[in-house]
Structure formats: C-alpha cells, structure tokens
C-alpha cells in the first residue's frame, strides 16, 4: 500500500495474484471465510516472523533469481507467497525493459526534478533485480503452478493473501479477523501488499473511507499522517525501504517521478512546510510499529 497521493504499479502485485488465483480455481474450501469468525480480543502472539530469513534474502541487492528458487522450496515460511510476488513484479519489469525513460526532467510537488540519468539508473537496478529469470519463469501458467503448489504445501502467507481476495464479500467481522491475522504475522511484505490494502474500511455512520487506529477513525481525505505512517510500517518490520531495493521507489524514479533515497525521505518531503506534521506522523508510525511487534494489532480495528 502507498499513500493515496502516489499510485505505484509495484504494489498492485497482490491484487493481480488474487485475481489469477480466483481465475484458475485456487481459492480453496477450508479458509477462515468458511468457519465462524473468531472475535480476536487482546494480543496476538508476539513472535519472530516465520519469514525472517526470507526477508533478509529478499533485501539483498542484485538478482532475485536464486531467491525465487529458494523461496519456492520453503512454503512453510511463506516462500511461495514471496516467490510469486517477485515473479509478478519482474514480469512487469521485463515487459517494459525496452522502454527507456523520458529524456526530459520531470518533477512532482514533493521532489526536485528527476534527471534522465537517475531514471535510467533506477530502471537498470530493476532489471538487475530480475536478471536470470526467463520468460517461461514469468509466464502465467508457471505462476499459477507456483500458487497451486504453495497451497498444496500449506504456505500460510499465500493462503491468507488469496483469502483476502474475497474480503469485499465478507462480513465486517470476518474481514477484521483476516486483517488481524495478516498484521499478527509480522511479515513486512504480507502486511505491505495485502494487509494494508484491506485495512481501508468504510465508516458505517458516514460512508467515508479511511483507517481505524487506536479507537479513532481517520478519513483518507482528511488525514494523510495515518497513510504515510502505514507506508513506513513495512520498513520498521524489516523491509529495505531504500532506493537500492525498494520496488516502489525504484519504479517511480524509473518512470520520471520523484527519486527519493528512501521512504523516510519521501515522507519528510511530503510533509515539508507543515509545522509538526512530520513529528506527528513519525510518532504514529512508532506506535503502529510497537503494536505489530508486540502483537497488539487490535488497535488497527
């Protein structure tokens, strides 16, 4: 998930994966949607994420080819989910590899103009991340097989991600139960690509879309501090949010938008000139991070 002010194709991978799974009949019986939703009270188990080793490998610079193969061999740690997310992103990278960035400089309201050299360097880094992956590796049929195999071998993250594809058709209680489990995983990629997408809720009293946090509803149109804090949350959970490895930052730079060095720098730029806003956003982020780390994820409901 990215703040509403910035639309990135890289964080749409989970949605595409969910649609693919539904299309090939991979949404299975026996998911939490088929059982009575538990009323989660109190804290989740605050433990080290099962994917901790995968996160470290995912963050390493350079090609992710070997990572994909390693991840597919470890579905018990969420590896199938990680692998299919990489394949989805790299499919887009290779599809646009022949398109060079615009030669002229561009700028957004939160950044200095982006030079063509910066854009080309970011595009090169993206291609390096996908080096060694063939067109066959990235074919729909291969990704569908990886999803099916991951479900057969009980990848917990993939099962939750696919179940989230039905969130729009669930009761609010079941949707909250799923959100609780996703956040309680403590995994930065699962939270970024899936949990934060379904965390956007509708206030039943007003019909306004926004986020619940610490018992207060924050409308998207009125409070960007919450969305910016959520944008930083995966960073604190272990994701490399520098332009060396962050798909979102790299893609925006490659496409001629801002070339922020990190998500933290981007947030600071967005809030520049608004007294106290940056400090408030960072304080919210720290409380969110502490809640996930301690298992107190009910504060997001």
Regions found by a protein language model. Name each.
Residues 2-15:
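N-terminal Sec-pathway targeting helices
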Residues 12-26, 83:
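Hydrophobic membrane-insertion alpha-helices, especially the h-region
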Residues 29-48:
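Ser/Thr/Pro/Gly-rich low-complexity linker/stalk segments immediately outside membranes or between
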Residues 49-58, 160-164:
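Alpha-helical segment of the N-proximal tetratricopeptide repeat
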Residues 52-60, 96-99, 103:
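Long, acidic/serine-threonine-rich intrinsically disordered regions with weak helical/coil propensity
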Residues 59-68, 173-175, 212-217, 223:
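Short linear interaction motifs
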Residues 72-80, 87-90, 94, 101, ...:
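Short helix-capping/linker turns of helical repeat alpha-solenoids
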Residues 242-243, 247-301:
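Terminal, low-structured helical/coil segments at or just beyond the last alpha-helical repeat
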